[in-house]
């Protein structure tokens, strides 16, 4: 058990009975030493150091509830976030993860305009009703229409007049044999016998109209004939195809976006809020710092109705500081990621399981969720992170190998890989993430002191297959602990294990001839 007094004492036994409160209290939290001649220590543990203790269970894995709070205002259907990294999360992955019930955090290594466009892409990917559909006026050229269709991957555009009234619909079929790119869209669009829906039409009513008329796009107009929305057959199909998707009040997928302490911070936050970002992630390698705390206060003062995730921290004091500054969720993790070298380069950090417990000890009574960022290698690690007090886990390398990630696909020795790099790597810092590590964005790349590396991860296929295995592992773990939901899982006990115990936990004394989709020793 972790000692209850005297931070330097050895751990006397192998059974650790520390659900949530085991690291609470002044003698067990990571506070700065007040006496410069005395150094206090606690034992720092990570996922491989412990196992969850099985308990009496009256629930089957398929019946557990895995919904969780991302912030006080946002509920996710699965406790999974994708990392705000430029080889992990852009619109395609954010869309795929939101459809499965999680949330993608778009990286910030791009211009404000491009990041806002990425948010817009997620929001437009599906919707109960598109309230701001892409439109063209009657005097636009066919070439403009084709470009818009290509850029937004859409097959039709409503055409409006100067007053906003619906004048017609332009689809791929109308343009199939057109060669004059300067011809006006009004000359080729469908304008007679337009089928529309009145304001207030719900999805069921829209589906009946679409089915009866055999069309794919249904403009919604008000009593004055002005276009106020668009309902598509594809959006209706998405509702049934992805029943676990997380959506906002308008039926659009949820998405987050990262920002840093930079000169364009407030402009970036404003742009992201304007296009509908559901949560902003104020991202730093060291969240317990003056710059982050002041930036957080400034954002909360100027944008009162916005959810902010702030981080990263690894101590009780750090978590409390961000909570007091207005964070709606706190992200935990200094150095646990597979591509992060902070602990080696800077000598600073806290093993991830202990860091999660530290943060949760500070925040649980405040009702502010903890996000465990980094260090997840197996599905069981996610279960342990949640049991230690996290509400969600954020993963980078796990998602970096998926089809939807933005990293380049490469072939090496006959196998497919995807590029993956830390945001503290030279490559990432040179294109925008240096402020995350408090380094001058204008400096020559040779002057950077990297805290991450660039590498590759095995190609893993579609994201939904990865999510399926992680959700399955979580359900299994909750079943073993007798937990009906994540709150009950956080009351589970841990047992501290030795290296021999971990070797015993892995497959051993056998040569694996057929790999499982959720297990590898590499």
Label each PLM-derived region with a short phrase.
Residues 30-56, 136-137, 198, 205-208, ...:
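Alpha/beta catalytic cores of nucleotide-metabolism and tRNA/nucleoside-modifying enzymes
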Residues 60, 64-76, 83-85, 114-154, ...:
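Bateman/CBS regulatory modules and CBS-like beta-alpha motifs in cytosolic regions of diverse proteins
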Residues 93-94, 267-272, 314-332, 377-391:
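Catalytic cores of alpha/beta
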Residues 102-114, 280, 284-289, 332-346, ...:
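Glycine-rich phosphate-binding active-site loops on the catalytic face of alpha/beta enzymes
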Residues 106-111, 154, 158, 165-181, ...:
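Short beta->alpha transition motifs characteristic of CBS
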């Amino acid at each position: 058990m972790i000692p209850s007094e005297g931070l330097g004492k050895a751990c006397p036994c192998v059974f650790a009975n520390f659900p949530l409160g085991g690291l609470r209290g002044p003698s067990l939290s990571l506070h700065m030493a007040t006496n410069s001649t005395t150094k206090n220590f606690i034992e720092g543990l990570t996922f491989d150091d412990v196992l969850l203790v099985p308990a009496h269970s009256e629930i089957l894995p398929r019946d557990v509830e895995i919904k969780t709070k991302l912030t006080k205002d946002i509920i996710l259907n699965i406790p999974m976030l994708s990392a705000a990294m430029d080889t992990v999360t852009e619109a395609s992955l954010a869309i795929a993860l939101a459809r499965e019930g999680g949330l993608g955090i778009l990286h910030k290594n791009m211009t404000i305009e491009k990041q806002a466009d990425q948010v817009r892409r997620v929001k437009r990917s599906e919707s109960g009703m598109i309230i701001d559909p892409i439109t063209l006026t009657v005097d636009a050229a066919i070439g403009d229409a084709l470009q818009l269709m290509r850029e937004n991957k859409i097959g039709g555009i409503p055409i409006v007049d100067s007053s906003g009234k619906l004048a017609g619909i332009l689809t791929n079929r109308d343009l199939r044999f057109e060669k004059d790119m300067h011809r006006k869209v009004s000359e080729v669009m469908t304008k007679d016998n337009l089928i529309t829906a009145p304001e207030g039409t719900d999805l069921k009513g829209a589906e009946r109209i679409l089915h009866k008329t055999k069309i794919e796009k249904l403009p919604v107009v008000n009593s004055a004939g002005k276009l106020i929305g668009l309902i598509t057959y594809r959006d209706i199909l998405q509702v049934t195809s992805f029943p676990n998707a997380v959506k906002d009040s308008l039926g659009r997928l949820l998405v987050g976006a990262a920002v840093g302490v930079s000169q364009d911070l407030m402009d970036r936050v404003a742009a992201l809020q304007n296009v509908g970002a559901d949560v902003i992630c104020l991202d730093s390698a060291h969240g317990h710092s003056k710059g982050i705390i002041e930036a957080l206060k400034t954002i909360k003062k100027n944008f009162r109705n916005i959810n902010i995730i702030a981080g990263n921290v690894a101590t009780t004091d750090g978590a409390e500081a961000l909570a007091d500054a207005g964070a709606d969720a706190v992200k935990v993790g200094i150095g646990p990621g597979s591509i992060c070298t902070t602990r080696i380069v800077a000598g600073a950090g806290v093993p991830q399981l202990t860091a999660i417990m530290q943060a949760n000890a500070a925040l649980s009574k405040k009702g502010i969720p903890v996000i465990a960022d980094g260090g997840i290698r197996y599905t069981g690690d996610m279960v342990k992170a949640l049991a230690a007090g996290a509400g969600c886990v954020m993963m980078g390398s796990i998602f970096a190998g998926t089809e939807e990630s933005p990293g380049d696909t490469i072939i090496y020795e006959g196998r497919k890989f995807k590029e993956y790099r830390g945001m503290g790597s030279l490559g990432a810092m040179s294109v925008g993430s240096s402020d995350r590590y408090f380094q001058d964005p204008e400096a020559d790349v040779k002057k950077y002191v990297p805290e991450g590396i660039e590498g590759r991860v095995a190609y893993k296929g579609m994201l939904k297959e990865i999510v399926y295995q992680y959700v399955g592992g979580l359900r299994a773990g909750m079943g073993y602990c007798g937990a009906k939901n994540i709150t009950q899982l956080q009351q589970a006990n841990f047992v501290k294990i030795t290296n021999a115990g971990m070797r015993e936990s892995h497959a051993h004394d056998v040569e694996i001839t057929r790999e499982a989709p959720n297990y590898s020793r590499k």
